[in-house]
Swiss-Prot record:
GO terms for molecular function: phosphatidylserine decarboxylase activity. The keyword Membrane applies. One of its GO terms (biological process) is phosphatidylethanolamine biosynthetic process. One of its GO terms (cellular component) is plasma membrane. Is synthesized initially as an inactive proenzyme. Formation of the active enzyme involves a self-maturation process in which the active site pyruvoyl group is generated from an internal serine residue via an autocatalytic post-translational modification. Two non-identical subunits are generated from the proenzyme in this reaction, and the pyruvate is formed at the N-terminus of the alpha chain, which is derived from the carboxyl end of the proenzyme. It comes from the Bacteria. It is found in: Cell membrane. HAMAP family: PS_decarb_PSD_A. The gene is psd. Catalyzes the formation of phosphatidylethanolamine (PtdEtn) from phosphatidylserine (PtdSer). Binds 1 pyruvoyl group covalently per subunit. NCBIfam families: PRK05305.1-2 (NF003678), PRK05305.2-5 (NF003685). The modification Pyruvic acid (Ser) is found at residue 189. It comes from Amoebophilus asiaticus (strain 5a2). This is Phosphatidylserine decarboxylase proenzyme.
Length: 225
C-alpha cells in the first residue's frame, strides 16, 4: 500500500478536490468537443495520480554503520568538488550535490548519527536547482550533525524553481540517527552535503542514489586512523 508523507496531505486533499470539480464539470456537459473533454479528463486523472506518487514515503530498512555517510536524499549526483564552505566550517570541504527531480522521493534523511549542532534557515530566490548559484542564492537550510567521535557533516536543503517549501524537523541539540527522516522539500530541489577532505568518496557523477540506502562516503574515526 502506498504510504503518503504528512507534508502532502493538505496539498493532495485540495488538489484532488479541484480535479474532482473539473471532472464533474466535464461530465455535466461543459460545451467542449469530445476530444478536448477526453484529453482534459485523462490529464486531470494523471495529474492527480502524480501528486499522490510525489508524496509517497516508502519504508526503508537502514543499514546503520558509524563510518559510513549515507545519502541524505534520492536523486542524481550532479557535482563532486572541493570548495570553501564559508557558513560554518570556513575551510575547504568536499561538496557532493544531489539533484532531486519531481519524480524522486523528496524525504530527506540524516547521513550520520549524532547531535544536531547547527541549523539555519536562509530565505532566498528560486533559481533552477542545478544552477551553480542556487546553493548560495536560493531559499535553503543548513544543518550540521556531529558524530560521537567529533566528525561533523553539513548538509544543505536547497529549494529549486518549482520547490518553494522546505521543511526541517529536528532542533539544535536533538539527537538524530543515521537514516532518520529529518526533512522534506516540495516539488524538485537539491541537497548538498559537505564532507572532510579525508573522506573516501563512494559515488560518481551522474550516479543515482537513494536516501538512507546508498553509501556516499566513508569517514573513519580519528582513533581508527
Amino acid at each position: 500500500m502506498l504510504r503518503i508523507h504528512k507534508e502532502g496531505k493538505i496539498i493532495i486533499r485540495n488538489s484532488l478536490f479541484i480535479l474532482l470539480l473539473l471532472n464533474l464539470a466535464l461530465i455535466g456537459g461543459v460545451r467542449m468537443s469530445k476530444s478536448v473533454t477526453t484529453a482534459l479528463g485523462i490529464s486531470s486523472t494523471l495529474l492527480g495520480l502524480w501528486i499522490l506518487y510525489f508524496f509517497r514515503n516508502p519504508t526503508r530498512l537502514i543499514n546503520k554503520q558509524e563510518e559510513l555517510i549515507l545519502s541524505p536524499a534520492d536523486g542524481k549526483v550532479v557535482a563532486i568538488k572541493q570548495i570553501y564552505e564559508d557558513e560554518y566550517f570556513k575551510e575547504e570541504r568536499i561538496q557532493i550535490s544531489i539533484f532531486m527531480s519531481p519524480f524522486n522521493v523528496h524525504v530527506n534523511r540524516s547521513p550520520i548519527s549524532g547531535v544536531l549542532e547547527y541549523f539555519k534557515y536562509h530565505p532566498g530566490k528560486y533559481l533552477v536547482a542545478f544552477h551553480p548559484k542556487s546553493s548560495t542564492k536560493n531559499e535553503r537550510t543548513t544543518a550540521v550533525v556531529k558524530r560521537i567521535d567529533g566528525i561533523e557533516v553539513l548538509f544543505r536543503q536547497i529549494a529549486g524553481f518549482v520547490a518553494r517549501r522546505i521543511k526541517f524537523y529536528p532542533k539544535v541539540g536533538d539527537e538524530v540517527h543515521q537514516g532518520d527522516e529529518v526533512g522534506f522539500i516540495k516539488f524538485g530541489s537539491r541537497l548538498d552535503i559537505f564532507l572532510p577532505l579525508n573522506a573516501d568518496i563512494q559515488v560518481n557523477l551522474k550516479e543515482h542514489v537513494r536516501g538512507g540506502k546508498s553509501i556516499i562516503a566513508k569517514i573513519a574515526s580519528e582513533e581508527e586512523e
